[in-house]
Regions:
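Extracytoplasmic Gram-positive cell-surface binding/anchoring modules and repeats
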Residues: 544
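Catalytic cores of carbohydrate-active enzymes across secretory and cytosolic contexts
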Residues: 1-540
Length: 544
């Protein structure tokens, strides 16, 4: 074989993907692992966990990583285990029957944009309630046959992992995600390469984002990732951390989500009836939508009417401090080319993000822009509707707050995700067979009176015992890593009262979360914390 001097002296780099090899009979096993449907199907989860419970926990209940870490001989042996193969075929049949249901085309199709999604702990692209709601939204849309796709960002480090030292101080760890070990897949082009979206940032440079897809039942979630060699060292970290970096990086993230997200759907040939912006982070989808309509020959006014008529904005934050504001200089640095594309002036663009048009001292607010470009705006509870109407009242001068078009849809949860296997079985045994598809039906819920009180109370006690066991295991593991005196840990666990009321404050302990409400009635607070039936209270604090 002959080599030219060029090939001898210059490295020839090739990208390869390394993956685990499964016996052909278990390909269906891997297929289910790559669809997050397993996160809310108890039979699917037990199929994985039952094989090797210890390895399942070591793999952090991630079926993709779990299969990768299993020995090939162990996997090969499964193919000769008739009992396991029958179970797998039964679960797979349920899975395929679920996927084969056609979307309900009598309802509007939806494109959903959010900065975070709380789908499962194995996919660290969420930090709090906003993400959990978004994740449940996708799961419920899948269960309800809604024709929906979603767009978000794929973070290399996600949000932080929390551990507690013996002195109660929070320890923060950012561990990188190995995308090849997650239940996601690359979106491929016809030439066999991963799809890359080229997003213009100002006139001077372009950011290149790899496109991935997470299958959430019947819903496709497209995720953008900038941590690749096409980008400079300054742009690769755009998707390193959720809500990480300074305000400039936050703006870069929101440009990627909004403008880059819309570009992604266009490349994939996806068009929907409604474009849903989950919080103001994704508001720039409407900049790109305006540009697309204008490029087709419409003027700005016509394009705005079409965009507004098909846009929905959900606001979650109850106070102005929780919204994103960008200084005009920073906003101009990255958006200065858009007035020409839109056929408007720079001041007109800025005014779209100002409560008071013409106020030069006012920064560009993503939430204000979302309100002005969306026909439908909703809060997340009846009370939050009233709060939001007051908060956005300056946008509609001459109207009483209660007259503006901010409505509400009360937050809910995806029942199959948050209900334990034990409760699911209890409901299945005692409720109407239509319960899972009609969970808010009060007539069905009347069946709860047929369940003996002792059965319900004993169920709660058993589940609480499991919770306490988990808390001890989790704290013990963290303390072991911190080289804490074991005797001190044991003494704390011995004081743990299983009969005490446990209150988990499931939100970040940021100031605008209004934790000070605990101290509005000090006498009542004193009675609660000093009562012989105590309360355990543990909030989650932000990394900063």
């Amino acid at each position: 074989m002959e080599y030219s001097s060029y090939h001898v002296n210059v490295p020839q780099w090739r990208e390869i993907t390394v993956g685990s090899h499964l016996p052909a009979e278990l390909r269906r096993f891997a297929e289910m692992a790559h669809n997050l449907w397993w996160t809310w199907n108890e039979d699917a989860k037990s199929l994985y966990s039952g094989l090797n419970p210890e390895l399942w926990e070591e793999a952090e209940q991630n079926p993709v990583l779990f299969l990768e870490r299993m020995d090939y001989e162990e996997l090969e042996a499964l193919t000769h285990d008739g009992n396991f193969m029958r179970k797998m075929e039964n679960v797979y049949s349920t899975f395929k029957a679920y996927l084969d249901v056609e979307p309900d085309h009598s309802r509007p199709s939806v494109a959903y944009f959010s900065m975070e999604y709380g789908l499962d702990r194995v996919l660290k692209i969420y930090s709090g309630g906003l993400g959990i709601l978004a994740g449940d939204y996708l799961k419920e849309a899948s269960d309800s046959n809604v024709d929906l796709c979603a767009v978000g960002l794929l973070y290399r480090y996600g949000y932080f992992d929390q551990a507690l030292a013996m002195d109660g101080q929070q320890q923060v760890h950012y561990d990188p995600q190995n995308f090849g070990q997650l239940p996601i897949e690359k979106v491929m082009q016809p030439d066999g390469r991963q799809l890359v979206i080229h997003v213009p940032y100002a006139d001077s440079f372009t950011v290149h984002a790899n496109v991935w897809k997470a299958n959430v039942g019947r819903v496709s979630l497209y995720l953008l990732d900038t941590d690749n060699e096409l980008n400079s060292e300054f742009d690769r970290p755009i998707t390193h951390h959720l809500y990480g970096g300074d305000w400039e990086n936050r703006l870069k993230q929101e440009i990627l989500l909004g403008i880059g997200g819309m570009m992604t759907l266009k490349v994939l040939g996806i068009e929907k009836d409604v474009y849903h912006c989950n919080e103001g982070h994704a508001a720039l989808i409407n900049i790109q939508r305006l540009c697309d309509y204008i490029s087709e020959g419409l003027d700005f006014g016509q394009a705005m009417e079409l965009v507004r008529a098909s846009s929905l904005y959900t606001v979650h934050t109850p106070v102005p401090a929780g919204h994103d504001y960008f200084d005009e200089g920073l906003f101009n640095k990255y958006m200065k080319g858009y007035p020409d594309k839109l056929g408007i002036t720079w001041d007109e663009l800025m005014n779209l993000g100002r409560q008071t048009p013409g106020n030069k001292g006012e920064r560009f607010c993503m939430s204000v822009f979302a309100c002005k470009t969306s026909q439908a705006v909703n809060g997340v509870s009846k009370l939050h509707k009233s709060v939001s109407q007051q908060m956005f009242a300056p946008l509609w001068k001459g109207y009483f707050p209660e007259e503006n078009h901010v409505g509400y849809v009360t937050n809910g949860v995806h029942f199959p995700t948050w209900c334990t296997a034990e409760w699911k079985k209890l409901f299945k045994d005692n409720f109407d067979e239509n319960f899972m598809n009609d969970q808010s039906n009060q007539e069905i819920w009347k069946g709860v009176y047929n369940i003996p009180d002792e059965e319900i109370w004993n169920m709660r006690k058993r589940l609480k015992t499991k919770l306490i066991s988990y808390i001890k295991w989790k704290c013990g593991r963290d303390w072991l890593k911190s080289q804490v005196d074991p005797a001190l840990g044991v003494s704390i666990f011995e004081k743990f009262n299983p009969n005490a009321l446990l209150v988990g404050f499931g939100r970040r302990f940021a100031t605008y979360k209004r934790a000070h409400l605990l101290f509005t009635d000090l006498d009542r607070l004193a009675r609660i914390v000093n009562n012989q039936e105590p309360v355990s209270y543990t909030p989650l604090t932000p990394a900063d």
